[in-house]
């Protein structure tokens, strides 16, 4: 959201710490003034290890700058479904922003998890984002099947996966503002649909979702489009562009859109090639907060509809939880020299 809607005249700079990676931490805080920094600690359960260690590192950074006690409370807030989160961070209750326990992280941008975006982009922009998402919700509820955009995308994806045997999907936006959207889509679809057990508890035979990848369309023409065009693999593709530019450089935009439309034609399967591509094009009039909200909600609804078609629960992630458990055991087996009984010998090397 922030990458798509930020401007060159932004008043607040927003930075994200997600991985437990000290290099990332140093690069971000190295350019910050602790006395002008607000830290938003966001975690649904408040048990995610990466969030905890980053919060502790930030806390230490503030302390080393002489920020503690009541001053610290002016520099840190918590967003969580865990009512004890603020207390656990030694912060007052007014620094706590609650979210619902029943909303998964990948569906939570519309909640207080979006606080950072609201602060950086402004409340009016964030409200427009919500309004756009709500408009898509209304469309899903009211539009007939033949005109229901998320349903059409879901049915196309389901057909590509189960009938045509296409196991991967490539997202190619021809717009710098949507460059990182593929990372969000990866989590949204693959964490929601990557299950081998159905909602009824039975093992699923056949595919459940596709591998999601992609990149900036124009740049990717010079890297993996050769493979898409003439390789022997099969790929479904969403190719997206905005008709109106978000800048004043008309010549650049004309070239960009020409490339997008040309590639939409070029990537379609030809008789002389062995590959099979199923290409869908999405054209947006212009990218603003409302349209971005609608676009994100479009893919959210597509994903949940695919869950219904595949017969799986798109709102849990048991594989992720298992990995967290093993990570914790390995971390503490090393620190306390326990044997790490659930881990194989390679993990303990």
PLM regions and their residue ranges:
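A SIS-like phosphosugar-recognition module
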Residues: 8-9, 20-21, 27-349
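Glycine-rich active-site/cofactor-binding loop and its immediate structural neighborhood
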Residues: 1-19
């Amino acid at each position: 959201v922030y990458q798509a809607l930020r401007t060159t005249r932004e008043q607040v700079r927003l930075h994200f710490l997600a991985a437990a990676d000290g290099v990332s931490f140093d690069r971000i805080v190295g350019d910050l003034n602790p006395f002008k920094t607000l830290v938003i600690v966001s975690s649904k359960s408040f048990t995610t290890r990466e969030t905890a260690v980053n919060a502790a590192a930030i806390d230490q950074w503030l302390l080393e700058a002489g920020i503690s006690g009541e001053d610290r409370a002016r520099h840190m807030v918590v967003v969580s479904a865990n009512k004890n989160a603020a207390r656990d961070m030694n912060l007052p209750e007014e620094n706590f922003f609650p979210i619902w326990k029943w909303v998964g992280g990948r569906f939570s941008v519309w909640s207080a998890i979006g606080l950072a975006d609201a602060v950086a982009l402004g409340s009016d922009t964030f409200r427009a984002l919500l309004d756009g998402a709500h408009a898509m919700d209304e469309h899903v509820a009211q539009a007939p099947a033949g005109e229901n955009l998320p349903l059409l995308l879901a049915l196309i994806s389901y057909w590509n996966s189960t009938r045509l045997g296409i196991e991967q999907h490539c997202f190619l936006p021809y717009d710098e503002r949507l460059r990182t959207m593929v990372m969000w889509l990866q989590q949204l679809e693959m964490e929601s649909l990557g299950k081998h057990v159905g909602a009824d508890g039975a093992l699923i035979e056949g595919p459940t979702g596709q591998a999601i990848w992609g990149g900036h369309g124009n740049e990717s023409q010079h890297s993996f489009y050769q493979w898409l065009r003439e390789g022997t693999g099969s790929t479904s593709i969403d190719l997206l562009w905005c008709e109106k530019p978000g800048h004043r450089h008309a010549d650049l935009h004309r070239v960009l859109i020409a490339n997008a439309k040309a590639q939409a034609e070029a990537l379609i399967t030809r008789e002389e090639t062995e590959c099979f591509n199923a290409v869908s094009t999405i054209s947006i009039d212009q990218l603003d907060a409302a349209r971005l909200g609608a676009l994100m909600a479009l893919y959210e609804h597509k994903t949940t509809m695919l869950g219904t078609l595949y017969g799986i629960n798109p709102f849990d992630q048991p594989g992720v939880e298992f990995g967290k458990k093993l990570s914790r055991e390995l971390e503490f087996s090393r620190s306390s020299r326990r044997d790490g009984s659930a881990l194989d010998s390679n993990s303990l090397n």
